[in-house]
Amino acid sequence: MNRIAVLLLAFVLFSCESVNTKRVISTDNAPQAIGPYSQAIQVNNTLYLAGQIALDPITGQMVEDKIEVQTHRVMKNLGAVLSEAGFSFDDVVQSQVFLSDLNHYKPMNKIYAEYFNSEPPARAVVQTALPRDALVEIMMVAQKP
C-alpha cells in the first residue's frame, strides 16, 4: 500500500510541475491588435510580444513618417505591453526587427539601443513590406528568472 501511495504522490508532483499557464496580456497603453492576435501571451515566466508598428495608442493612427519617431513609438508600445505583464526591457531575451528599407538600419539601431542596458537581447533584422506603410515593426520575447 505504501508503494502505491508513493507512486501516486510522485505522479501528482510531476504532473503539477509540467502544467503550463497561458495568459493573454492586453493594455490600453499600446495599440489594440489590428487583426486576430493578442498584444502578448505569457506562458509561465516567458512573455511573447506580438509585433508592434508605430501606431499611436490613443488615436490608432501612424505617427510621423520618420524612422526615429516610429522606432521610439514602437519601443514605447512594446514597453507598455511589457509593463502590463510585470516585465521590463531588462527581461527581453530576443527581438526581431522588420524594416521597410535597410537604409533605416543605423537610425533605428541608435534609438533601439537607448532602451537597453549593457546586455541587449539577441536580435535579427530583416527588410520586408509592412502593414500601414510602417517603416519599422518589432516583436520580442521576454523571460523572467
What are these regions (language model features)?
Residues 4-8, 16-76, 80-93, 98-145:
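N-terminal presequence-like segments and the immediate start of the first folded domain
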